[in-house]
């Protein structure tokens, strides 16, 4: 099982809109593609949104991730929820 930590910087004034679109559009679509969201948090002081995503498949992470981004449903998200984001770094993490 592979886990990824994502730490997004959200554009000023757009956190509520981002959270709503993430919750209503991104999360259900990620789940449809075999991902599970393990947790999500807002850091008000830095205008950041942090979440942890997991995929249990035996495939390399890039395979289901590409399927997600290339899916008609993801391409059809209009407007694109990513418009709320300034930076989107992410890292693979493991349990200690």
Where are the language model's segments positioned?
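Short glycine-/aliphatic-rich beta-strand segments at the starts of folded cytosolic domains
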Residues: 2-10
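Accessory recognition modules or surfaces
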Residues: 6-7, 42, 47-64
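Short, acidic/polar linear motifs in exposed loop/turn regions
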Residues: 12-14
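An amphipathic, aromatic/His-enriched active-site/gating alpha helix that lines ligand/cofactor pockets
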Residues: 17-38, 54-91
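Long, low-complexity, Ser/Thr/Gly/Pro-rich intrinsically disordered segments that act as flexible linkers
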Residues: 42-48, 84-96
